[in-house]
Amino acid sequence: MQGVKKRVEKLHDLLNQYSYEYYVQDNPSVPDSEYDKLLHELIEIEEKYPEFKSTDSPTVRVGGEAQSSFEKVNHDTPMLSLGNAFNEEDLRKFDQRIRDSIGKVEYMCELKIDGLAVSLKYENGRFVQGLTRGDGTTGEDITENLRTIHAIPLKIKEPLNFEVRGEAYMPRRSFIHLNNEKEQNGEQPFANPRNAAAGSLRQLDSKLAAKRKLSVFLYSVNDLTEFNATTQSEALEELDQLGFKTNQERERVSDIEGVLNYIEKWTSKRGSLSYDIDGIVIKVNDLSQQEEMGYTQKSPRWAIAYKFPAEEVITKLLDIELSIGRTGVVTPTAILEPVKVAGTTVSRASLHNEDLIHERDIRIGDSVVIKKAGDIIPEVVKSILDRRPNESEIYHMPTHCPSCGHELVRIEGEVALRCINPKCQAQLIEGLIHFVSRQAMNIDGLGTKIIHQLYENQLIKDVADIFYLKEEDLLPLERMGKKKVDNLLLAIEKSKEQSLEHLLFGLGIRHLGVKASQVLAERYETMDQLFKVTESELIEIQDIGDKLAQSVVTYLENSDIRSLIEKLSNKNVNMSYKGIKTTEIEGHPDFSGKTIVLTGKLEQMTRNEASEWLKMQGAKVTNSVTKSTDIVIAGADAGSKLAKAEKYGTEIWTEAAFIEKQNGI
């Protein structure tokens, strides 16, 4: 079991690092397929050994950060990603898990459109706001650009309040036309329709977006309170009736064999479509069964995305470059002769670690096979031995850090080489980049290039130095005009007000993720109280394991860290928790902790208003009646939900009874 525990800890380290590089830095060091593989491994371990699953596990994260070109807006409910399946075995495991949980099941199969996920909000039947997915929690407001898409109705037939989600995409014909125009104008063409769609929707001038001829397929309703659907297929049919564009190639199947037949059909037919797809989405069709299965923090348990097999090409490995991460891990990266893979030109691919290089016998000068698992980030699959040059040599990682010259070490149980010098320049810079990221101190405008300049000009050596920067420090930097400097200084000043959990996460304490930072901040409230905490005390807290407890205490006992905190405090950086404590949330005694379903037409308020009020009282409002539903509030013309409530013996209230409870009568 000790070996399993060490592997879980290693997977946590790797996945957190890769997620940070990809979603926060926008500078991934590994291919998406490697991340998916490691995540898949961790999921399987956690399923087999539930005692090793923690609330800050990478399997509950949703990685990723919204761009800054448009206003950032929080989603009413998170836009979760889907779990991935890459082969028949993965799909059969998913099916078995579903049937073990809810018994007999019917699936809805839908094409996975290769575009940009969007969320559209309607109030009284009018389109009022459109957001990108962003990091799943916060998206970009691209309403004006979405209004230019003719497939999105600006007003629907009924005065409903809801949010509908889907995929904006560029049809292949529009893509070809756009790239022809760009080439004629001497501009760089887009690599693929997906990039073109994303770039078009991020145009600040909506007139330019309008010229791009985008379209959209809608695939889910976020809040079915005002809908009558009891299945995914019925929900899509209702969207059709309201005037929305849904994908008509969907198919309802009775079992996993039907799913496999659907995948086989579209694997061969995908080229005949007028738009790109990168897989198939499989969902449990019955909405009450979806409700029963629920969600992880990362994805719904009742759906999965099958990814089409990756395209493979051959190119030459020109060199191996090394990079050092925030935790000191040294990662080798293949420098490749540029080659087109799945629509984009690839010139770099991660080699992960020395063990993988030796296992695959990859050498500089080799002809290598490259693929994009998931059609996103490239990886080196293998060398082609019969093309190997006679003078090739086995590659060996250096013995000393390429940044600071300190001796590299391999910690027992790990495959990575690490630089353990706390003053290593590369690590310090990566730590600074982490500190200013959105989930940490969220200092908008302080990007990677500026941090490099500040460090190289000896203007910052640690995170506290950021708060001592002045206008005269910033103005001489490259591409830093007066307005940009003023905005950056305002962002730095604003970040001082961040709640304690953001500071804790930003400090980069080993093993301390976003969730655990929140737990510690809420429990201890101030940095002063955290300084007094003991390892044995931390271990008693749910979600804080032995390794994290030891890491936190060791970090906070360090005299250099205490000096750093004092330096931050001297610049009035907030050291207190500003959120609402879980224990302080009080709701209406008749509703708090209850699972409630609204159905039918209410006279005194809309169902949306009733839903919001109930949530404020601590109730959980769901769309489907299940055996776990506590109360069904039925208005006029209540349909199948009322019938199901009667079948289950669920408590049923009229609107009048609900209002009496509201008023305490």
UniProtKB/Swiss-Prot annotation:
Its cofactor is Mg(2+); Mn(2+). Keywords: DNA damage, DNA repair, DNA replication, Ligase, Magnesium, Manganese, Metal-binding, NAD, Zinc. Its EC number is 6.5.1.2. InterPro entries: BRCT_dom (IPR001357), BRCT_dom_sf (IPR036420), DisA/LigA_HHH (IPR041663), DNA_ligase (IPR001679), DNA_ligase_AS (IPR018239), DNA_ligase_CS (IPR033136), DNAligase_adenylation (IPR013839), DNAligase_N (IPR013840). PROSITE patterns: BRCT (PS50172), DNA_LIGASE_N1 (PS01055), DNA_LIGASE_N2 (PS01056). GO terms for molecular function: DNA binding; DNA ligase (NAD+) activity; metal ion binding. Residues 586-665 form the BRCT domain. It is an enzyme of class 6 (ligase). The active site is at K112. SUPFAM superfamilies: BRCT domain, DNA ligase/mRNA capping enzyme, catalytic domain, Nucleic acid-binding proteins, RuvA domain 2-like. DNA ligase that catalyzes the formation of phosphodiester linkages between 5'-phosphoryl and 3'-hydroxyl groups in double-stranded DNA using NAD as a coenzyme and as the energy source for the reaction. It is essential for DNA replication and repair of damaged DNA. HAMAP family: DNA_ligase_A. This is DNA ligase. The gene is ligA.
